[in-house]
Amino acid sequence: MDLYPEENTQSEQSQNSENNMQIFKSETSDGFSSDLKISNDQLKNISKTQLTLEKEKIFKMPNVLSQVMKKAFSRKNEILYCVSTKELSVDIHDATGKVYLPLITKEEINKRLSSLKPEVRRTMSMVHLGAVKILLKAQFRNGIDTPIKIALIDDRINSRRDCLLGAAKGNLAYGKFMFTVYPKFGISLNTQRLNQTLSLIHDFENKNLMNKGDKVMTITYIVGYALTNSHHSIDYQSNATIELEDVFQEIGNIQQSEFCTIQNDECNWAIDIAQNKALLGAKTKTQIGNSLQIGNIASSSSTENELARVSQNIDLLKNKLKEICGE
């Protein structure tokens, strides 16, 4: 199936109709950008683990009906693979770790989707983040001690520890520094803060090297991602979460995102299972009444027993006081 409608674009475009591949290039005084898009038809041979539930193993049905059901519930896996490249110069005033650079935005994704046929475009619901390669290049001579720290974070996550996707520390004394981060997760296109999912933070430590208004370095980044109609459409290669190019091993180091330690907490199994809960996605209403819970939460009957026991103890204490007072 051809994902792309026939239309003219103002940007420089080359298209291989046989392979369903498009390349867009644009270059202005602000910088250079390039985009590569490949349709799913070119990558049918990629092996994927299928999540299926066979209706024939649940219901007894005639062979003819079985075939009709298979056809009725079949779903085409739509995947649009994208590689986006951008380059921009950074003012030394903006290289102090106080600002962030969004590496993928809703506007960019909408631009990619606009090239699809309407019947395909309206099915796209997820973006899968595969890899981000970042190259920093100095705009000054080699040999100047210029340490730099870079972090790629998911700024939607509130915890500063958990938001880290990867961090690197290097030096631009040799003119350039490069590393690659592999996020390897998918998000809904309707998530509220999509632009903050891939946020690049950079801290240039030699802040007195130049004055405000001077461009200190160039950031060039490549983002590989896929737009799909399902969260189950993509499998990722088993790369590390972050890699440092071999040539930069001696002048830099990296920090991977941490995987949490799962606690086997047998004491906290309380969950609200009351009826009349609100529908997922619907506006919630204030619920009046008692909630029913399972787990290690005291039930109403055990509470009543405890109150009865306390009352009994009070009566015994009252009788004891009467004996002491000679009443």
Swiss-Prot record:
The record's Gene Ontology biological-process terms are: transport of virus in host, cell to cell
What range does the record give for the signal peptide? none
Primary location group = host cell
- What GO CC terms are in its UniProt record? host cell plasmodesma
The listed locations are: Host cell junction, Host plasmodesma
Which controlled-vocabulary keywords does the entry list?
Answer: Coiled coil, Host cell junction, Host-virus interaction, Transport, Viral movement protein
Checking InterPro entries in the record gives: Caulimoviridae_Movement, Viral_movement
The residue stretches assigned to a coiled coil in this entry are 297-327
Quaternary organization: Homotrimer, through the coiled-coil domain. Interacts with VAP. May interact (via N-terminus) with host prenylated Rab acceptor protein 1D (PRA1D).
Q: What family does the Swiss-Prot or TrEMBL record give for this protein?
A: Belongs to the caulimoviridae movement protein family.
Function according to Swiss-Prot or TrEMBL? Transports viral genome to neighboring plant cells directly through plasmosdesmata, without any budding. The movement protein allows efficient cell to cell propagation, by bypassing the host cell wall barrier. Acts by forming tubules structures that increase the size exclusion limit (SEL) of plasmodesmata, thereby allowing viral ribonucleocapsids to spread directly to neighboring cells.
Q: Can you say what this protein is called?
A: Movement protein
Recall the taxonomic lineage recorded for the source organism.
Viruses, Riboviria, Pararnavirae, Artverviricota, Revtraviricetes
